[in-house]
Amino acid sequence: MRAGHYENRKESVDIMIRSSREIIDDLIGYGVDFERDDNGHLRFTREGAHSTPRILFHEDITGKEITSKLLAQVQKLPNVTILENTEMVDIVEQDNVCYGIVCRVSKEAMPHLITISAKDTVWACGGIGGLYTHSTNFPHLTGDALALSLRHHIELENIDYIQIHPTTLYSEKPGRRFLISESVRGEGAILLNRKGERFVDELLPRDVVARAIYEQMEKDDMPYVHLSLENIDKKTIMEHFPNIYQHCLEEGYDITKESIPVVPAQHYFMGGVHV
């Protein structure tokens, strides 16, 4: 609540916290491979605004590990059909009741529209990262469902609540930004200005750290600041952050020997349809 400036919906926070252990058990049952110590106990890392390590993880690709295992479970369900390369373009509405959606199917040689009729439609709007210069999202996420919500008078809320992740690898290339996990800072990485000076507590809430980085970028007249992993031993880097290490190496940076340029980027869209 404190990290959310006490503007969080208390009911949602309570549900998230009280159901977390049950959900973790479900994820493990689906095959999510959270890291464990030599005794088989779950390992925890630390992230921003946390007073103690309490984050489960899988190497440095926890999100991919969870979503891939969830997708595998969905693909096994006999009552679920997954349509790929299919873009929603409108709602089928009559007398203020939703009866399904209209989609554009683009996987065939000739793209065409189809109508999917449904007694119930789950309106999950997704992200908006494609609207930003710097975002960890895929560029096709442009908030189309939000625009349709406005067209059909569906109530939105908190659409100005956009989470900026403090550290993504700076690049002048187009496309999504590569996330430098917050747990890197949780393990001891520090942020430095152009003079090599530390300028912020790296484990403050994300909005505070991102703001401090933007302010430092303006002071330095630079499009990025530096992230140094000098306080993390090489073994931890290679075991905990193998994918970050490899990606940075491909971009010309050896994070075991040098700092890397990082920039804040849009990460999560916190608002959406009122529920």
Q: Where do the language-model regions lie?
A:
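Short hydrophobic core segments
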Residues: 115-126, 149, 196
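Hydrophobic or amphipathic alpha-helical targeting/insertion segments
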Residues: 20-23, 32, 145, 151-152
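Glycine-rich active-site loop/strand segments that organize a redox cofactor
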Residues: 1-16
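Conserved redox-cofactor binding core of oxidoreductases
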Residues: 28-112, 119, 124, 168-171, ...
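An anion/pyrophosphate-binding glycine-rich loop and adjacent beta-alpha core
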Residues: 148, 154-267
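Flavin (primarily FAD) binding-site architecture
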Residues: 123-137
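A glycine-rich dinucleotide-binding beta-alpha-beta segment and adjacent secondary-structure elements
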Residues: 83-84, 89-104, 244-275
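Extended, hydrophobic alpha-helical segments in both membrane/secreted and soluble proteins
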Residues: 121, 141-148, 275
